[in-house]
Amino acid sequence: MVDPQRMIDTECSLRRLAKASIVHIDHRPVSLLPMLLMLIVLGISAGCSVPDREASYGSTGSEPEQSTAKESATNEPRKSTAKESATNEPEQSTSRKVSQLSLEEAVGQMFVVGVGGTEPDYYIEKMIRERNIGGIILHDYNMQSKEQTQAMVSELQKLSIKTSRCIPLIVAVDQEGGRVSSAPWVTYHPPAAAVGQSGDPAQAQRIAEEIGRQLDAAGVNTDLAPVVDTGFGAAIGDRSFGSDPHLVSKMGAAAVRGFEAAGIISTAKHFPNHGAAKVDSHTSLPVVDHDMQTVLSYDLPPFKRAVEAGVPMVMVGHLLYPAIDPERPASLSPKAIKLLRQEVGFDGVIITDDLAMEGVKQRGTVAQAAVKAVSAGADMLIISSPPQEQADAYAAVVRGVKQGRISQDQINDSVDRILKLKQQYLLRNSCGP
């Protein structure tokens, strides 16, 4: 589709040029207007062309076909830091890009999905080409070496750039240090608890920057870290910097600055605070019975400090906080999202913990959780479950918008935040505005 503004600009140009369209060659008057018309029209067509999609769901608006279990699976350039790249593209360009996306394309940007192996396969290529997904998450079983990871990421990024209007993928890993270290080429670093015991924020910042630079070398642009949970509860343990929110706050903020120095998207997690939970959300839904005063004074301060330090993404956990919302876990709760936006003051990208975890699946299917999370205000959804569940979740969100259960404005707001994040950290100069 031709940009209406460009058509207006073209019409104005033609009016100006028509007056000066007669020149003399060999002393004979020649009209250049037909030639000018042809060149300008060709210029518009070239400028607005987009690579064809193969039976794109975005072009048809139909619900994606369901893949079956029988279907067989078949060096990004160094990016500038956030401060360097923030001025590469006018701020209003993200809104323009959002307006150019179909509903199906926009919804796809909200999904960060798991990959099945160590190289691109039919399913992940289908998710990129036909659902326009916003990112992938890589686990230890996806990454054998830096070179293999780099090759896989490069191939998937090229596919995304080709098929989604030059929008790159979020490529996320869990690389916290200690026992949560999924990238085998990254130098081992001690767990957060050991770093916290040092009491030295400079150490936290240095470690985060080293991790970030080593991830970046393989094309990984997002770390689902740091953990800014306070306390050593179930599933967290030594992943936390400590049980003192003041200590966790300064260590977490330092880690955010370290990732920022490396040009990596960091993620403060798990809001409101998994460190106080007695149950692991991978296996069940934790209930944290803190009153609101404790939430405000103990659970939230590290997240506030991370936001003040410039963290671009916050992960909401599968945690039931009755003082916040007695019915829904934070990842599916409008009240929890509102608390994060208004009380903590975060205006960046909110991403859910993996919707394939039992802590949320006990309350329904992955597709149902996806609709609830988007309705609650989450911007991005992590889904590491099998391809069929990923496709079902995507289709459910698209259907939810079409049926009026999710507002189009909410989708647009989320995708605008996602594209601003990508513009700041990921977009290459070759992509243009």
Q: What role is predicted for each listed range?
A:
Residues 182-187, 221-239, 243, 269-285, ...:
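Active-site-proximal loop/short-helix segments
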Residues 29-52:
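Sec-dependent N-terminal signal peptides of Gram-positive bacterial secreted proteins and lipoproteins
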Residues 4, 47-66, 71-79, 83-131, ...:
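Preference for extracellular/luminal or secreted protein segments
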Residues 102, 144-161, 165, 247-405, ...:
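Second-shell residues forming the walls of enzyme active-site clefts
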Residues 157-187, 207-227, 248-272:
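Glycine-rich, aromatic-flanked loop segments that form ligand/cofactor-binding clefts
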Residues 109-115, 134-137, 169-173, 223-224, ...:
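Hydrophobic faces of well-ordered beta-strands that scaffold small-molecule active sites
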Residues 14, 18-35:
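Bacterial N-terminal signal peptides that target proteins for export
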Residues 198-210, 246-249, 295-296:
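Glycine-rich anion/phosphate-binding loops
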